[in-house]
Regions:
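ABC family nucleotide-binding domain
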Residues: 5-226
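C-terminal boundary and immediately downstream tail of ABC-type ATPase nucleotide-binding domains
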Residues: 214-217, 221-223, 227-246
C-alpha cells in the first residue's frame, strides 16, 4: 500500500450465499480518520460488506488488508483482529444477564488486555463519555433502546479499536432516541476515530461523514464526498434512491 494513511484495503471482494452472489468484486480503501457512510437499498449487500471487514462474514474470494496484513489468509487471529476493528450492531447484542459494567469489561478481561481494576476504571470512563455513568450496575432490560446502543458503543471502545464498524446503529430505535446515539457518533468522528457506518440517516451521512458510498446490487456504484454525493450524484440509480429518501 503506497499511501501511508491507508489503514484498510479491500481488493476484489466477493461473497456468495449458495448460488446468490451478494458482493460482486468490491474494491476500496479506507484512510485513517475517515468517516464513511454506506448507503443503499435493502438487500444490496451493504451489511454483508461491513460484516466481512472483521470476518463476521468470511469472504468467498478477494482480500481484506488491514495495516499490511491480509485478513483472508489462513491462520489469522480473529480475536486479535476484532480488538482492532470494533463492531456496533443494529440490535445492541448486550448480554442480558450481566450488568452494564460487566458487559463492557468482559472481553478486555477475558482476552487478558486489562486487569479487572483497569477494565472497571475504563468502563466507568467510557460510561461517563456516553452519558451513562449512573447505569453501571443496571441490567440491559432496565435501559431504553438508545441507552443500550450507547452502552454497545462504549463496549466496542473498551477494546481501544483502530476502526469502528456500525451496522445500522439507529434503525432499531424509537425516533426520539436516534439523536442521542448520533450525537455520540458525531463526537467519536470529531475525535478522529476511523468509522464505517451502514446507515439510513441521511443527515448524519451529509453532515458528519467524509465519504459516502452507495452500494447497489453488490457493487459500489458511487463513492464521493458528501456534497457531490447528495447534490450532484452521477449514478442514475443513486439519483432515484435519493429522490425517494430525501
Amino acid at each position: 500500500m503506497s499511501d501511508t494513511n491507508i489503514i484498510l484495503e479491500v481488493k476484489n471482494l466477493k461473497k456468495t450465499f449458495d448460488d446468490h452472489e451478494v458482493l460482486k468484486d468490491i474494491n476500496t480503501t479506507v484512510k485513517k480518520g475517515e468517516v464513511i457512510a454506506i448507503i443503499g437499498p435493502s438487500g444490496c449487500g451493504k451489511s454483508t460488506f461491513l460484516r466481512s471487514l472483521n470476518l463476521l462474514e468470511v469472504p468467498t474470494s478477494g482480500h481484506i488488508i488491514y495495516e499490511g496484513n491480509d485478513l483472508t489468509e489462513k491462520g489469522v487471529d480473529v480475536d486479535k483482529l476484532r480488538q482492532s476493528i470494533g463492531m456496533v450492531f443494529q440490535h445492541f447484542n448486550l448480554f442480558p444477564n450481566m450488568t452494564i459494567k460487566k458487559n463492557i469489561t468482559l472481553a478486555p478481561i477475558q482476552l487478558g488486555l486489562m486487569s479487572k481494576e483497569e477494565a472497571d476504571s475504563k468502563a466507568m470512563e467510557l460510561l461517563k463519555r456516553v452519558g451513562l455513568s449512573d447505569k453501571a450496575d443496571s441490567y440491559p432490560d432496565m435501559l431504553s433502546g438508545g441507552q443500550k446502543q450507547r452502552v454497545a458503543i462504549a463496549r466496542a471502545l473498551a477494546m481501544n479499536p483502530e476502526i469502528m464498524l456500525f451496522d445500522e446503529p439507529t434503525s432499531a430505535l424509537d425516533p426520539e432516541m436516534v439523536g442521542e446515539v448520533l450525537s455520540i457518533m458525531k463526537e467519536l468522528a470529531a475525535s478522529g476515530m476511523t468509522m464505517i457506518v451502514v446507515t439510513h440517516e441521511m443527515g448524519f451521512a451529509r453532515e458528519v461523514s467524509s465519504r459516502c458510498m452507495f452500494i447497489n446490487e453488490g457493487r459500489i456504484e458511487e463513492d464521493s464526498d458528501p456534497v457531490s454525493f447528495f447534490d450532484t450524484p452521477k449514478s442514475a440509480r443513486l439519483k432515484d434512491f435519493l429522490s425517494k429518501v430525501l
